[in-house]
């Protein structure tokens, strides 16, 4: 007889190798055929809603690692919620207006100046839809389950119509106004920018100290002094109309040789060192408030520079006397307005100085720095010129420096509802908790929101102007424009004359001749995406406002979190979200930002083509995503190793359940042995820990718990112990069925627990699970813990055993290294445990050979009675010797019972019995 044929070895068709790059697309086709999204929604219908609202990625180019991290995190949450009692719809979105699409077309050779705005916008829309399609397929490849056939896209007519309504509601409440104010201006884009559209990069700038002679000292100064200002933007000096000082600061009149200078007293030493003053002497001090209304002379123009008081003046740098140009700075503008200064801005849309800057007209602002500095030197006003590298705002699209420039723009008044915004921030749950402080401070400190842009591709600002110049925004015009957009799309604004966009028969007192013109500016794209709570959450029947969660990168505190909050609070008085979760950025393995120049860009598509989507998803679950995260080939190799461990665990479980029918072979919990019940307790611990971790969005805890369970609890302990019984005993042996009962519970629970993270693998496992009836594991619920009587005592006892087992394994390893034994099954061990361990060992003595995987086990006295040569460990002394007897051909155990059964001379007594009872007819 071939005894190897009597062993019940694992048997399954579940493949050992994942081959995910090939298998996953096939699984996704299967999901598409069965309409998995609709199936899950149908299955969870009627449950409480959980809405995670998708922040729309920008529709331009392939998805990058930041996109992958974001979408996969969202997918974890949505999948978990749909398996824990919620209906969790997920509607993906795309942000489709804005400058990058205009630039992409220009780069492709589109001659926009040779076509109408409407024609150019049609090309923009076509391009945007192509990009949506491209990204949609890439997101689907990640295994993200979503309503891919019905996304929201910001260029769609229904969306634009709702955005117009949001604008109209804000205007109705008096929150929208037109005014001339300094705004972030990008000369390269020729447009205003919002705070969310700027990024800071290092820039080299001139750093100059300039003297402004006093013209009128107002009886506080003698008139022969000079104010010293410091600036890194010499090009703004032609626009200087004043000098700001702090009312509470003390200012010093400093005599240096024959000159007298005015600076803040506490900056005396710093300025003296910078300007290399020798023998400088403070001859007088005055309070800043006393200097108000003194007058200085502009260094190279024949005009006054008024000295004003400003709370914005600090002593962090400079001189305490601040160059003030109301057309080129927010603080300057506010102070200048208070003192009645004009808003002088001698720079045009392209960043070129105009004839209001005599002597420098026609120069690009940055190129004007040198001639202006030379002019200052010529007139004796330049005290110091150096160059510094400092953090400076840049256009996030063109990556070029931006300027502050006063222009006529449309604004949303944040001041009008700032209190409500701050209350909404306080009522929201923030993860991480510092998010609340971050957004609170942004809302507290931000100025009014400049919402107009001087571009073509976007949603028009729905304002008309009467003949007398009055802007017209009424319920009637807003509703009419919204209806037109819903029917024809926003291109209609550029295809029709103003009169054809107004309601029929519309009249206005400011237009006696019935003539009107329309606004040509478009809305900031942050107003587009920031209106999604109205256009998507409120409008779609399967969603609700407020959403339960917004989840985006940490850059969105100043972006989508902020713009959505602003429009929602303005329109509804409440935040559009109950909770906000943010994640960090994806860096390379060395913690560097990814960039083409370094050549360290990791592309999701490449990972999926080489390793598979589930490996990428497992990586997402492994990182502390609330901070910046790292990815590299080495990191992915480690993750792939963990994946292999999990997959092999599934394969082992399936292989050993091939002959198990849960409805017929399950053993009642009360009838299981202690070790089996202990394993159920460990499984319960895993279920609780993993579900709690999912609930708190701690996916790294899920990853580590599952990995540790597979490697430590299963592979290194229970499965190792179980093999002897599973393979050697007869199919229906009570101990074997007991172990299979536990393995079955583990298999079902583990498959469900990994489903949110590894959906492809979980759905690959599911059809092999005995008794699985559902078409997909996604249509099941998360596992519940099994009631195990006396679980606390059981856990305490067996956790203690596991520490003792570690001692025994160490002793066996030493014996192996010293060539006392070959493998552990060659060993005979005698234990001399501590007193408390002894009683525990006696209570489970019949299982100990299998638990230690040795051929012979003896219990000696206590640790104090152990032979002196016996190695002592924390809980026991261990004597390891070669087991006596011969090796059984079937089970490999060394036994003195080999050959006792004459019919089976090479088998031990146990194997001979099993063979006779199960295989001999």
Curated annotation (Swiss-Prot):
Subcellular location: Cytoplasm
GO cellular component: cytosol
Residues given in the record as L-isoleucyl-5'-AMP binding sites: 552
Cofactor: Zn(2+)
PROSITE patterns: AA_TRNA_LIGASE_I
Residues binding Zn(2+): 888, 891, 908, 911
Binding site for ATP: 596
Record-listed E.C. numbers: 6.1.1.5
Family: Belongs to the class-I aminoacyl-tRNA synthetase family. IleS type 1 subfamily.
HAMAP family documented for this protein: Ile_tRNA_synth_type1 (MF_02002)
Name assigned to this protein: Isoleucine--tRNA ligase
The organism of origin for this protein: Bacillus mycoides (strain KBAB4)
């Amino acid at each position: 007889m071939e005894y190897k044929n009597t062993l019940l070895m694992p048997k399954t068709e579940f493949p050992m190798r994942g081959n995910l790059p090939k298998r996953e697309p096939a699984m996704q086709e299967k999901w598409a055929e069965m309409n998995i999204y609709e199936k899950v929604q149908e299955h969870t219908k009627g449950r409480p809603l959980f809405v995670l609202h998708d922040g729309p990625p920008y529709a331009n180019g392939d998805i990058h690692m930041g996109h992958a991290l974001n979408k996969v995190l969202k997918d974890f949450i949505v999948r978990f919620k749909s398996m824990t009692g919620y209906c969790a719809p997920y509607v993906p979105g795309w942000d489709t207006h804005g400058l990058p699409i205009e630039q992409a077309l220009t780069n492709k050779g589109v001659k926009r100046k040779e076509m109408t705005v409407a024609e150019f916008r049609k090309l923009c829309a076509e391009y945007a839809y192509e990009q949506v399609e491209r990204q949609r397929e890439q997101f689907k490849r990640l295994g993200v389950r979503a309503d891919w056939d019905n996304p929201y896209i910001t260029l769609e007519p229904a969306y634009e119509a709702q955005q117009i309504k949001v604008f109209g509601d804000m205007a109705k409440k008096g929150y929208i106004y037109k005014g001339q104010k300094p705004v972030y201006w990008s000369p390269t884009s020729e447009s205003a920018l919002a705070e969310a559209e700027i990024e800071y990069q290092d820039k080299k700038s001139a750093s100059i100290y300039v003297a402004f002679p006093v013209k009128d000292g107002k009886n506080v100064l003698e008139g022969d002094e000079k104010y010293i200002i410091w600036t890194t933007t010499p090009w703004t000096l032609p626009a200087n109309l004043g000098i700001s000082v702090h009312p509470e600061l003390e200012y010093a009149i400093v005599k240096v040789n024959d000159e007298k200078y005015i600076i803040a007293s506490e900056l005396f030493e710093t300025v003296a060192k910078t300007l290399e003053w020798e023998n400088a002497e403070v001859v007088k001090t005055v309070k800043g408030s006393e200097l108000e209304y003194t007058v200085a002379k502009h260094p190279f123009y024949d005009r006054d520079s008024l000295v004003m008081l400003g709370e914005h003046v600090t002593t962090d740098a400079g001189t305490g006397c601040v160059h003030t140009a109301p057309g080129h700075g927010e603080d300057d503008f506010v102070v200048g307005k208070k003192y009645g200064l004009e808003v002088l801005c001698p720079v045009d849309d392209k960043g070129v100085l105009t004839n209001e800057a005599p002597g420098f007209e026609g120069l690009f602002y940055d190129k004007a720095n040198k001639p202006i500095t030379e002019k200052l030197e010529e007139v004796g006003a330049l005290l110091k010129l150096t160059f510094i590298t400092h953090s400076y705002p840049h256009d996030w699209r063109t990556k070029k420096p931006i300027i502050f420039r006063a222009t006529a723009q449309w604004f949303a008044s944040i001041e009008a509802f700032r209190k409500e915004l701050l209350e909404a921030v306080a009522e929201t749950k923030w993860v991480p908790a510092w998010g609340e402080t971050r957004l609170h401070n942004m809302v507290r400190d931000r100025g009014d929101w400049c919402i107009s842009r001087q571009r073509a591709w976007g949603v028009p600002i729905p304002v008309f102007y009467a003949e007398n110049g009055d802007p017209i925004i009424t319920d009637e015009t807003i509703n009419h424009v919204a209806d037109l957009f819903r029917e024809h799309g926003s291109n209609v604004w550029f295809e029709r004359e103003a009169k054809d966009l107004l309601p029929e028969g519309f009249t206005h007192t400011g237009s006696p001749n019935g003539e009107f013109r329309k606004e040509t500016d478009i809305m900031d794209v942050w107003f587009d995406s920031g209106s999604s709570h109205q256009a998507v959450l409120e409008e779609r029947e399967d969603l609700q406002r407020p959403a339960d969660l917004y989840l985006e990168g940490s850059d969105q505190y100043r972006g989508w979190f902020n713009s959505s909050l602003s429009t929602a609070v303005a329109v509804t008085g409440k935040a559009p979200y109950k909770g906000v979760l943010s994640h960090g950025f994806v860096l390379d393995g060395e913690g560097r930002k990814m960039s083409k120049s370094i050549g360290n860009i990791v592309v999701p598509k490449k990972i999926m083509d080489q390793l598979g989507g589930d490996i990428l998803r497992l990586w997402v679950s492994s990182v502390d995503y609330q901070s910046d995260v790292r990815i590299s080939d080495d990191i992915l190799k480690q993750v792939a190793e963990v994946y292999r461990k999990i997959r092999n665990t599934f394969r082992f479980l399936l292989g050993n359940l091939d002959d198990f029918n849960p409805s017929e072979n399950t053993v009642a919990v009360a009838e299981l042995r202690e070790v089996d019940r202990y394993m159920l307790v460990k499984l319960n611990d895993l279920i609780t820990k993993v579900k709690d971790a999912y609930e708190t969005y701690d996916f790294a805890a899920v990853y580590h718990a599952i990995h540790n369970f597979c490697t430590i609890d299963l592979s290194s302990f229970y499965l190792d112990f179980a093999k002897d019984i599973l393979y050697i005993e007869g199919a229906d042996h009570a101990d074997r069925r007991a172990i299979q009962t536990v393995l079955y519970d583990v298999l079902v629970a583990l498959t469900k627990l990994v489903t949110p993270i590894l959906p492809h693998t979980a759905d690959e496992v599911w059809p092999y699970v005995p008794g699985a009836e559902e078409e997909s594991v996604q249509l099941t619920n998360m596992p519940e813990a099994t009631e195990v009587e006396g679980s606390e005592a059981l856990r305490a006892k067996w956790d203690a055993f596991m520490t003792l087992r570690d001692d025994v394994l160490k002793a066996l390893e030493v014996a192996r290294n010293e060539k006392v034994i070959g493998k552990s099954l060659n060993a005979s061990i005698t234990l001399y445990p501590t007193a408390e361990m002894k009683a525990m060992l006696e209570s489970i003595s019949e299982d100990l050979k299998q638990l230690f995987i040795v051929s012979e086990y003896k219990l000696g006295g206590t640790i104090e009675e152990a032979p002196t040569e016996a190695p002592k460990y924390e809980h026991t002394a261990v004597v390891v010797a070669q087991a006596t007897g011969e090796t059984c051909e079937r089970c490999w155990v060394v036994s003195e019972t080999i050959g006792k059964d004459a019919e089976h001379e090479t088998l031990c007594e146990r194997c001979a019995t099993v063979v006779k009872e199960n295989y001999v007819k």
